[in-house]
């Protein structure tokens, strides 16, 4: 029996061929199911990538693993993208092409797929089988839409709100801190003198000078506060006339920047925030907490001192003989006038030694510094949230601008359908 237990508990006793046969008969695991038609797997290294050699590389790779990487499998293209929308736009523009450009491809070459179509909108609709596209969601309020045109119209609300909030703030107030702790006069002067930038000018002129990280050496956080959102009444601009790859790089830049800014936000909620059940968690006050703990240990009560012999027999326990205290006449007690000239010795004074004064000053300085740092952290968090909202609006706006033409062609109805739809009536006509 012990020999059987030894065989069951040891891995070396099971031959490798048996392990391989069990692995072949086992059903598909959840990790294998993650390999979809887009050709990617979570936590799988990209072919040709190198292992990190420093702690900074390890943290960067860990952050990148949080977001899935998409590989283009059209004729072994191998291009890598961070968003399904970017991969879908790459397929429609670079591989499917257009008839006007004489590079229209109506047959699917994704992996082993051999689907054939007769129109461009048919092949673009078929590509959604291979690309894990999701409904277009607003990064600010998480509302979802079927088409980028609908999301683009919805973004007008957030653009107007952001412009109103910026107009209420005083000019130059974003570069000034509320507390005495600041970043330096040179950085504040630079923040005040930075010119306002439009989205088109930032993408065409300034974007190549920055890395998509919030706290970089180029002070991208100060430049973001001076970007002017496009007017809600005229969504479009000069980016529509730029090459598709140009806008695609801008979408990838703001997507990576939004992910980096979201990671920098504090993930811990305040102490008095509602818990998962929706109840308010209140911490006890210090005086209430320490009031429950007795200051001195409990002592048994002593019997009262009495002088009458009748009361003594009832109050005092048996077997104990206590003698009453002798009475002292009042004439023998000293008068209080003798201590009148020494009254100043018993009055509390606010006089401290040099060491006590130094320790008090250090405690006051530490408290003021802690309060200033807390206010500075709150100001930085508020500024980060406001700038993250601006970055998300720009990201969604550029994504809608990128895929607007593709979805317009896919959702267009034939002329015969539109003509027949115009003749339909809401209620049937009744003939008498």
Curated annotation (Swiss-Prot):
It is found in: Cytoplasm; Nucleus. It comes from the Eukaryota. Activated by C-terminal proteolytic cleavage by signaling protease (probably RIM13) at neutral to alkaline ambient pH. Its main location: cytoplasm. One of its GO terms (biological process) is positive regulation of transcription by RNA polymerase II. A motif (YPX[LI] motif 1) lies at residues 296-299. InterPro entries: pacC/RIM101, Znf_C2H2_sf, Znf_C2H2_type. Keywords: Activator, Cytoplasm, DNA-binding, Metal-binding, Nucleus, Repeat, Repressor, Transcription, Transcription regulation, Zinc, Zinc-finger. GO terms for molecular function: DNA binding; zinc ion binding. One of its GO terms (cellular component) is cytoplasm. Residues 22-64, 163-186 are annotated as: Disordered. A zinc finger (C2H2-type) spans 70-95, 106-130, 136-158. SMART domains: ZnF_C2H2. Residues 46-61 have a biased composition (Polar residues). A motif (YPX[LI] motif 2) lies at residues 427-430. Transcription factor that mediates regulation of both acid- and alkaline-expressed genes in response to ambient pH. At alkaline ambient pH, activates transcription of alkaline-expressed genes (including palB/RIM101 itself) and represses transcription of acid-expressed genes. Binds to DNA. Interacts with RIM20, which binds to the two YPX[LI] motifs and is required for proteolytic processing. Belongs to the pacC/RIM101 family. This is pH-response transcription factor pacC/RIM101. It comes from Eremothecium gossypii (strain ATCC 10895 / CBS 109.51 / FGSC 9923 / NRRL Y-1056) (Yeast). The lineage of its organism: Eukaryota, Fungi, Dikarya, Ascomycota, Saccharomycotina.
């Amino acid at each position: 029996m012990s020999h059987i237990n030894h065989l069951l508990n040891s891995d070396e006793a099971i031959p490798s061929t048996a392990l391989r046969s069990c692995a072949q008969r086992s059903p598909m695991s959840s990790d294998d199911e993650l390999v979809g038609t887009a050709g990617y797997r979570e936590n799988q290294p990209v072919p040709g990538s190198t292992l990190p050699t420093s702690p900074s590389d390890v943290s960067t790779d860990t952050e990148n693993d949080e977001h899935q990487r998409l590989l283009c499998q059209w004729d072994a293209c191998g291009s890598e993208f961070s968003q399904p929308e970017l991969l879908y736009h790459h397929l429609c523009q670079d591989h499917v092409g257009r008839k006007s450009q004489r590079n229209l491809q109506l047959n699917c070459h994704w992996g082993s797929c051999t689907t054939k179509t007769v129109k461009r909108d048919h092949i673009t609709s078929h590509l959604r089988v291979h690309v894990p596209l999701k409904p277009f969601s607003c990064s600010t309020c998480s509302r979802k839409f079927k088409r980028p045109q609908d999301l683009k119209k919805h973004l007008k609300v957030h653009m107007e709100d952001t412009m109103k909030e910026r107009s209420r703030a005083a000019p130059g107030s974003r570069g000034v801190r509320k507390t005495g702790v600041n970043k330096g006069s040179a950085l504040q002067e630079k923040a005040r003198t930075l010119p306002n930038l439009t989205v088109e000018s930032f993408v065409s002129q300034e974007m190549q000078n920055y890395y998509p990280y919030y706290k970089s050496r180029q002070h991208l956080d100060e430049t973001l506060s001076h970007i002017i959102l496009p007017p809600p009444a005229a969504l479009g601009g000069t980016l529509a006339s730029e090459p598709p790859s140009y806008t695609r790089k801008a979408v990838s830049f703001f997507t990576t920047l939004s992910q980096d800014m979201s990671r920098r936000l504090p993930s811990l909620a305040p102490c008095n925030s509602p818990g998962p059940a929706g109840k308010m968690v209140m911490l006890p006050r210090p005086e209430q907490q320490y009031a429950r703990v007795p200051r001195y240990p409990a002592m048994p009560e002593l019997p009262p001192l009495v002088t009458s012999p009748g009361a003594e027999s009832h109050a005092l326990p048996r077997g104990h003989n206590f003698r009453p205290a002798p009475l002292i006449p009042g004439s023998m007690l000293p008068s209080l006038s003798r201590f009148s000239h020494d009254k100043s010795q018993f009055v509390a004074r606010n006089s401290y030694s040099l060491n006590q004064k130094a320790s008090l000053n250090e405690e006051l300085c530490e408290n003021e510094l802690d309060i200033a740092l807390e206010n500075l952290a709150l100001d930085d968090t508020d500024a980060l949230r406001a700038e993250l909202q601006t970055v998300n609006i720009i990201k969604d706006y550029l994504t809608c601008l990128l895929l607007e033409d593709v979805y317009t062609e896919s959702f267009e109805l034939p002329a015969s359908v539109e003509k027949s739809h115009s003749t339909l009536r809401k209620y049937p006509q009744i003939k008498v």
